[in-house]
């Protein structure tokens, strides 16, 4: 019984850690350790960062769709309804955030970037 409780507790801790949003500083620190070559895609750190960006993109995309469905003005309006981002552009944007603000989540950084990059026309 104690063993089961320990396993459940450990699983809950790991799940809670995974569910926390990564900060921009954490993202940049992890990205700096990844070599810029084809083998980078084989690294677990690379896959973790890709998943973080994918999750952030899905989150802000869902927020945009929810705002439209509710009749509110969305935070950003990309042409064609979708925005694509290259790895270099993303890293450049995250590196441009002042160190004092790098405690924001990657999701928040992307939200702000998309609002700046793809502003919605005034109604």
Q: Residue ranges of each PLM-predicted region?
A:
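Sec-dependent N-terminal signal peptides
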Residues: 4-13
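N-terminal signal peptide c-region/cleavage motif recognized by signal peptidases
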Residues: 14-18
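Short N-proximal segments of mature Sec-exported proteins
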Residues: 22-92, 113
